[in-house]
Amino acid sequence: MNWEVVKLRLNMALATLGITLLGFALALAVADYAFGAQFGVGLILSILIFIFFLNIIQWLFGPYMINWAYRTVEVTPTDPVYGWLYSTVAEVAKYNGFREVPKVYIADVPFPNAFAYGSPIAGKRIAFTLPILKLLNRDEIMAVAGHELGHLKHRDVELLMAVGLIPALIYYLGWWLFWGGLFSGGGNGRGNNGGLVFLLGIIMMAVSFVFQLLVLSLNRMREAYADVNSALTVPGGKENLQLALAKLTLSMDPEALERFKKKSTTNQMASMLFFTNAIEEVPTWNAKELVEIWKTTKVPWYADIFMDHPHPAKRIQLLDKVSKY
């Protein structure tokens, strides 16, 4: 077992456990202080039930909303134009031990992307946008499919939905404290000073943002783990996923190569937040050059702190460390 994989798994486990335990401990302590133990625990349970119900509804029926928003069309094995895409996903699914091939969709949107989603009702699904099919070759699409199917195999949606309850719990608890302190003059617990409870509510809502950053950090780890999955399960997955990442970056941000030559590590991350008119063709030699630059790029720890994906240079360097094929 590669040590980098072991370290990544350990970090993910510690992050998940740490966010959960710290979040619940903070919420219970604050609720007990402001409202007393009995009412505080009841309030936390009520908030959890509320946000859990909302998340479950979103999870179960979200795939149908995604299909509507992205104007997706399902690809069948006999599709005369995109049947190759279904067979590609089927091959990668076999490498990853799937009993059934996830449903394959093409999304009619103007930016290159691929994503995995699903629910017990909708089943497992993977979608590719039209621009990404024009941008990448079949081997690169296969590597991207290895990444996306890794999300389904590792149940990342369910895990992040569960951990995401923590910042929501802290925020709504802060909301209760805010209005409770503002109108009731305090709670029933030890912290019966209305002004203090009001201030505590503001602090808790701010703290929820900090916990959201922690969840984003976990999300980046899961994305890195999906990269690892592609490298370890798809033949040629490392090199092809690296090229795919470079092509996607250059498609959305043609100046990225020149900036990285100048040792800039932050500007391109901001530009990728916006959906611009993507370039449909990126020369492979440009992508290879960008990959080589990324391999030696030193990325500040804060470069991707607000992002849900790791900085691409970090992804390239991790793939080099864990590749099997």
From Swiss-Prot:
Which cofactors is this protein said to need? Zn(2+)
For this chain's record, the cofactor binding note is: Binds 1 zinc ion per subunit.
One Gene Ontology term of the biological-process aspect is: proteolysis
- Write the record's keywords in alphabetical order, separated by commas: Cell membrane, Hydrolase, Membrane, Metal-binding, Metalloprotease, Protease, Transmembrane, Transmembrane helix, Zinc
Q: What is the lineage of its organism?
A: Archaea, Thermoproteota, Thermoprotei, Sulfolobales, Sulfolobaceae
TM annotation in the entry: 10-30, 41-61, 159-179, 196-216
Q: HAMAP family, alphabetically?
A: Pept_M48_protease_HtpX (MF_00188)
- The superkingdom of the source organism is Archaea
Q: What's a single GO CC term here?
A: plasma membrane
Q: So what family is this one in?
A: Belongs to the peptidase M48B family.
What gene name does this entry carry? htpX2
What GO molecular functions are on record for this protein?
Answer: metalloendopeptidase activity; zinc ion binding
Q: What is this protein called?
A: Protease HtpX homolog 2
Where would you find this protein in the cell?
Cell membrane
